[in-house]
Amino acid sequence: MIKRVVAPFCAAFVLAPFPLAAHAAPDCGSIGNFLAGKAVILSCFHSDDLRTNNSRTTPLNNSMATFTNGAPLPGVSVLGLPANFGSFTPVTDRGVISNGPTPTPAAVPGVQVEAGFLSDPTGQARFVLRFPDTWNGKLVVAGASGTRSEYNGDYAWSDYVLPKGYAYASQNKGVLNFYTVNFGSVGQPAPDSCRVNPPPRVGGLPGGALSLLWVHFYDVDPDKPFTQWTQYMLDTAKLAQATAKVAYGKPVRRTYAVGTSNGGYQVRRAMEEGPNLFDGGVDWEGTYIDPTENILVDLPVAVRNFPAYEAANFDPNSQAAQNILAAGFPPDIVHRNPSMGAATASLWANYYNEFWEVTTCQWQQRFDPTYDTFGAGPGNYDYLSRLGLPGVADSVAATTTTGKIKKPLITVAGTMDALLPIKHQARAYEDAVNASRKGNNDNRNAQYRLYEVQNGNHIESYVTPFPELVPIQPAAQQAFDLLVAHVENNAALPPSQCIPKGGTIAQVPAQPGNCAQLFVP
């Protein structure tokens, strides 16, 4: 049974069970009164189960028709899809980083709060808060991957921490996803639009089904700089801590940050910029941004060379393949017809069709909007040669991950990540952390660890077509428990290590440091 209150305000390591303290039960009345003047379109309801087993926990895709200020969402209707298609996709978002709900034995009754930030003039910034009736005094604040919504972590993180008694908060980095501009145009139909999939190649593997669908990502707009990603991670922590105190009548004792991909970036920045708000963080394949090393250096190389690699029948010795490998990418996994030798599947092809071009387009338009994306070609973008143009270096520098962490941080990353290649992403951030402290790690309170998941990749669902891969989620969740034990019980964090295919994080690893092989059969 769900009791709902809607207020139109203008505003595998196992920890020993922690005894759950007595506290007031959270209720929507007191929460709503507190959030008046801070939130808009606030919805608060008590649920018998805050896990995703309950269909009400995660809203349906495209279930929002307006911005939080009441203005209608933009977009055109194509292919029978609603005009608001793409702006708000919670169900899709939770499955991007996880294959499904984290199995837990019992329901978690409590209060869920959904709202927008009153302070955002664009009407896009949103958050969700979950307060279990039985609370352990602690809070988890989640980042959001890609351009995903505040429900991005529902499977991987919310389902994992709520049964342990944590309150949970998440946000959308202050920005919605995308809206449809056109379907059917061969060329770019409007400035700042990106096509969802690249066009199919003659004689190649099937391409993405939406090569003629053009969308506009909200976060390329001038009033949505990537610097807001850090702002909303910190703002959500403050808001959730204050609301939890009202809900339970007691202050939060510990706050942890978790997040994946761009959400992992938010975790890193939280440890760098918000040590007064957090006790530690786990970043799962977080995005590394540096003026001289970022995905705009690597991705165009892959976009440019993949068609030639495919035309060479996915020959790993082809010049195109060697160019992609030289850009830091892990090796491809190719499945072939045993009788004909023709490729039937390619890991790189999946990334090319679904991520490489559209991510290049989006990031280039954000940091270097004067480049002619589809006239000159996304694969021909040369970031380093354009650093001297007005605004490019400054906009990247404003979002740099410095490595100057002030609270304990664990990075968990897959060696087969072909969107954020581990050589130039997770390992680069590890180098930044070490450089900031001259290698002196364990003698500091803000310890850092990098746990590399051998054969793990960026997209958990790819383990189905490519069973050679392994999921990262179990290691990320284990890392969270290890972090909590370290912060609260002074337990030693296992050293940075290569987690062998099918293994777990070990106190005495067989392979400390980086994985010698990115892929093992």
Predicted features and spans:
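Bacterial N-terminal signal peptides that target proteins for export
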Residues: 1-9
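Intrinsically disordered, low-complexity sequence elements enriched in Ser/Thr/Gly/Pro
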Residues: 1-2, 21, 92
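Hydrophobic alpha-helix-in-membranes signature
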Residues: 7, 16-18, 407
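N-terminal leader/targeting segments
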Residues: 11-12, 143
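C-terminal segment of classical bacterial N-terminal signal peptides
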Residues: 13-23
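C-terminal His-loop and adjacent cap/lid subdomain of alpha/beta-hydrolase
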Residues: 25-521
